[in-house]
Amino acid sequence: MLKTGVLLLIFLVLFPLATLQDADQPVERNVENKQDLNLDKRRGMKLLAQRQQECCDPDWCDGACYNCC
């Protein structure tokens, strides 16, 4: 019984704690990558993403459309 308790403690508590990474690492990495971009490049990327949105039919548009209503 004691052996199973020790095994459960190791695998359910200690092992996940040892393998966890900082939650803020990916965010910091993305921020560092975007700091190198100049403002014009960021605007271009944003405009490209907005152009890729689907247009809706004006007959059934609910106001959530980007360009079509």
Swiss-Prot record:
The keyword Secreted applies. The modification 4-hydroxyproline is found at residue 58. It is found in: Secreted. It comes from the Eukaryota. GO terms for molecular function: ion channel inhibitor activity; toxin activity. Pfam families: Conotoxin (PF02950). Residues 1-20 form the signal peptide. Residues 21-51 form a propeptide. The keyword Disulfide bond does not apply. The modification Pyrrolidone carboxylic acid is found at residue 52. The modification 4-carboxyglutamate is found at residue 54. InterPro entries: Conotoxin. GO terms for cellular component: extracellular region. Expressed by the venom duct. Keywords: Gamma-carboxyglutamic acid, Hydroxylation, Pyrrolidone carboxylic acid, Secreted, Signal, Toxin. The cysteine framework is III (CC-C-C-CC). Belongs to the conotoxin M superfamily. Probable toxin. This is Conotoxin Fr3.1.
